[in-house]
Amino acid sequence: MAGNKKRGGRNMDQVKKAAVRSDGVGGSATNAELPMANLVRLIKKVLPGKAKIGGAAKGLTHDCAVEFVGFVGDEASEKAKAEHRRTVAPEDYLGSFGDLGFDRYVDPMDAYIHGYREFERAGGNRRVAPPPPAAATPLTPGGPTFTDAELQFLRSVIPSRSDDEYSGSSPAIGGYGYGYGYGKNM
């Protein structure tokens, strides 16, 4: 049963078959695992709002995208190997786009790569430490202190005076105005 184990919604045998291209050369298994949800999200961004996408269309588009990524990736990998490098650089992909006839994609991709590198240099990909917890805020000098989160919670639970005036259900009406139910009769 190990061969029929599900992974990403596909049978593992199907993944292995998808990883072998039609010319018999083995592609990488990661190409066959291009996330369908991400692809469908991209498709929905370019279609009109109420357009529906059939299951067969999703599958065919996924297969085409996997084939395209593999095709361009193999060409970029060959460029890196020709220069005796094991790491495929973004410039290898740019060159493979040009060599394969996708010239109009080279300039936008180059601009994106340049912007991404600037973002990285500026430290944009580093996780920022969360801000320190809010300092306690004194309500009155010498009185109790509450954090901003506690104040927000209290404001959501305790009705404001304006709510009391309009609802007519406040125990403070006719009382001393403290809003805690202490009326004249108590």
From Swiss-Prot:
Pfam families: CBFD_NFYB_HMF. Keywords: Nucleus, Transcription, Transcription regulation. It comes from the Eukaryota. InterPro entries: CBFA_NFYB_domain, Histone-fold, Transc_fact_NFYB/HAP3. Residues 1-24, 123-142 are annotated as: Disordered. Its main location: nucleus. The keyword Transcription regulation applies. GO terms for biological process: regulation of transcription by RNA polymerase II. It is found in: Nucleus. Residues 34-40 bind DNA. GO terms for cellular component: CCAAT-binding factor complex. Residues 61-72 are annotated as: Subunit association domain (SAD). GO terms for molecular function: DNA-binding transcription activator activity, RNA polymerase II-specific; DNA-binding transcription factor activity, RNA polymerase II-specific; protein heterodimerization activity. Heterotrimeric transcription factor composed of three components, NF-YA, NF-YB and NF-YC. NF-YB and NF-YC must interact and dimerize for NF-YA association and DNA binding. Interacts with MADS18. Forms a ternary complex with the MADS6-MADS18 heterodimer. Probably not a component of a NF-Y/HAP transcription factor complex. Shows impaired association with NF-YA/HAP2 and CAAT motif binding. Component of the NF-Y/HAP transcription factor complex. The NF-Y complex stimulates the transcription of various genes by recognizing and binding to a CCAAT motif in promoters. May act through association with MADS-box proteins. May regulate the expression of genes involved in flowering. This is Nuclear transcription factor Y subunit B-1. It comes from Oryza sativa subsp. japonica. The lineage of its organism: Eukaryota, Viridiplantae, Streptophyta, Embryophyta, Tracheophyta.
